[in-house]
């Protein structure tokens, strides 16, 4: 990606980064802009995002993911399950360089995209190809502080995939839509069976994005 001053960062399709991006990413805004360009070019070409998402890349995808950092403690190891195009893991890694972010993705073309972005932007993430439910993956990545995800699966199934990857006392934190309260009630037995405690729902990014992000946190208690 070409280097340029933050003040002139723009793309004909993506546009200028919003003011909130400067607040969230600080002196790493350049990396966020380079990632936005990856999404708008290679991400579209490889079918990781639809073309109609380009004008909404900042608000709906990058900032929506990065604000998850508001509810993650400093220095945590984070496993991003089904990372896909790198959401929420890559924006989180850019906004929070104190975190150790591991991007977990089973599909080869998505894994290759993640590896390319991680290498070219020198993000320092670990990119792993595999499925969260695979015992070998649990052995390799288990004991994390936090497991993140975005639009991966229904909450009950997501809990079964996520909690084995975190230590007791850790938690899964999933970005979910407005129906998350109904999911939490519907899947309560499945969550408990997976070793999860009482779930909490928080809104993050209220001062930064037009539509704040719903985060469901489920602690691993056994």
Curated annotation (Swiss-Prot):
The keyword Repeat does not apply. GO terms for molecular function: rRNA (guanine-N7-)-methyltransferase activity. Keywords: Cytoplasm, Methyltransferase, rRNA processing, S-adenosyl-L-methionine, Transferase. SUPFAM superfamilies: S-adenosyl-L-methionine-dependent methyltransferases (SSF53335). It is found in: Cytoplasm. Signal peptide: none annotated. Its main location: cytoplasm. The keyword Lipid biosynthesis does not apply. GO terms for cellular component: cytosol. Its EC number is 2.1.1.-. S-adenosyl-L-methionine binds at residues 82, 87, 132-133, 150. Belongs to the methyltransferase superfamily. RNA methyltransferase RsmG family. Specifically methylates the N7 position of guanine in position 518 of 16S rRNA. PANTHER family: S-ADENOSYL-L-METHIONINE-DEPENDENT METHYLTRANSFERASES SUPERFAMILY PROTEIN (PTHR31760:SF0). This is Ribosomal RNA small subunit methyltransferase G. The gene is rsmG.
């Amino acid at each position: 990606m070409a280097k340029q001053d933050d003040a002139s960062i723009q793309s004909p399709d993506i546009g200028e980064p919003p003011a909130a991006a400067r607040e969230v990413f600080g002196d790493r805004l350049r990396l966020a802009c380079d990632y936005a360009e990856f999404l708008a070019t290679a991400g579209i070409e490889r079918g990781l995002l639809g073309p109609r998402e380009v004008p909404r890349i900042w608000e709906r995808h990058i900032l929506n993911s990065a604000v998850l950092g508001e509810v993650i403690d400093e220095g945590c190891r984070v496993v991003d399950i089904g990372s896909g195009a790198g959401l929420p893991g890559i924006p989180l890694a850019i906004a929070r360089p104190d975190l150790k972010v591991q991007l977990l993705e089973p599909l080869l073309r998505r894994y290759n995209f993640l590896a390319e972005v991680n290498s070219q932007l020198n993000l320092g993430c670990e990119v792993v190809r595999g499925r969260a439910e695979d015992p070998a993956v649990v052995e390799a990545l288990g004991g994390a502080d936090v497991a993140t995800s975005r639009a991966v699966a229904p909450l009950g199934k997501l809990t079964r995939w996520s909690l084995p990857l975190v230590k007791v006392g850790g938690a899964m934190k999933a970005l979910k839509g407005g129906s998350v309260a109904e999911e939490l009630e519907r899947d309560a037995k499945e969550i408990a069976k997976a070793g999860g405690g009482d779930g909490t729902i928080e809104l993050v990014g209220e001062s930064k994005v037009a539509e704040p992000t719903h985060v469901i946190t489920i602690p691993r208690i056994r």
